[in-house]
Amino acid sequence: MLSSILDQGSYLILSDFERQQQVLTLARSLIFEGVEKLNGPASRQELEQQGLSLLHNVLAAEQIGPLRDLVMPTLRPALLEMVCSIGRLLGIDDEFFVDDYTILRINFPYLVAKEASRSAENPGIGRVDESTRKQSVASKVVDPNYNPKAYHNNEPPAAWAHGAHRDTWTGHSRLGVNLWWAVDNVPEEASMVFYPGTLNADFEPDRRSLYLAEGYPLPKPVKMSLRKGEMLVFNPEVLHATHLNTTSVTRLAISARINPVRPRFSTSCFYAREFWHSSTNIEAGHFDRVLRFERNENLEPAIDRSVVPPKFPQLIELEADSHDNEWKRVCESVKIAEGGKLRVRFGNENVLLIRTSAKLHASQANCPHLGVALADGFHDEKQLFCPAHGLAFNLQSGLSSCTALRLRMYEVEERQGDIWMRATNRASVHVAA
Ligand code: FES
Ligand SMILES: [Fe+2]
């Protein structure tokens, strides 16, 4: 099992494992208790009636951090034990390591989270042992290129979602195995997004976001729903992302990480997750013994990948006014093969032309969420997937599963071997996504 995850980049979903029900019950009851401590018994009662997936109805986004502070220290020993038993289930016989950094991922629906204040925590922020916290604060490293606020377009941190990445790009260890555990039912559009087959592909991160740089086309994303209690186990070097939570429910998951061997870090990231528990200590009940593997002493030379330059679809620049109704000739039809894309600078607007087997479509070229270039996203006959957070846009209408995020569409026609387009009828499309 372990080698297929590590060597082939596959993933598996565990539906039944040791300590699963006991720790799930503990995690859920700690969340209910935390809500009661923060907002009183009436809020707890309301949450018990409505279900945890409606947590955002009783908790403000600004209280996600305080709730984590209440839940994680008590949950930590039981969680470490459960993670350790999963390591054994995966077939690791010898001593292995469990990351001290664990995350209670609370992703409110995007439309709720985007109204939060700046002080509300990012869903991807974890918690560590108290001793680790003090040491990490003392040795914090800052990279001047890294600017997550700019990537997230200054949206409140509670609304942030991870773009496509490998975990070693963000300071995690080599040869890790990620555990991602559904504390409540997780619908597909609030889940993880995977790009199978990308384990050994040549991709580069953008140094400003540590997510995939522009110019690397992605394969079809795999999205998966999980039932309450199911555990996704995957190789974090396969490109993966967080789906923008376009549902009306809060996503609740806990993530942890195993390293079958002593953790080592990539030279490509400026910091490293240095604090770990050994399976020997966890199995002996020593949950507060944390080992430190200092980055500088545990670096591994970068994997020798050829540096592949980014590849962008052809760009055609047209003089145009997007407010008039005039048709403009773009280029010869043969410039876009079936399944291909072409970028057009239409006056001062960026447009993406996409050819399916049936027809040509023209849409705005950047995602209405954070402006990421859609040219790298996979498309099929009906949909274009954003390469950042997996959102699917209908190629006919531009609609997505989020009412606030819709692509502007352009009219496009082929006449006697040429492609023509114009920017009209923007409000007249009524096709369902
Ligand atoms: S940038 Fe987030 S879904 Fe496109
Ligand atoms: Fe990740």
Walk through the language-model features, giving the residues of each.
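Short beta-strand His + acidic residue motifs that chelate non-heme Fe in jelly-roll/DSBH
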Residues: 234, 239-247, 375
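Catalytic core of non-heme Fe(II) oxygenases with the double-stranded beta-helix
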Residues: 158-224
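Short cysteine clusters
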Residues: 367, 386-389
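Non-heme Fe(II)/2-oxoglutarate
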Residues: 243-321
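Signature of the catalytic double-stranded beta-helix
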Residues: 53-174
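N-terminal auxiliary "cap/dimerization" subdomain that precedes the catalytic jelly-roll/cupin core
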Residues: 1-93, 302-322, 414, 419, ...
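Conserved metal-binding segment of the jelly-roll/cupin
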Residues: 226-239, 387-388
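N-terminal pre-ligand scaffold of iron-sulfur
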Residues: 309-380, 395, 408-433
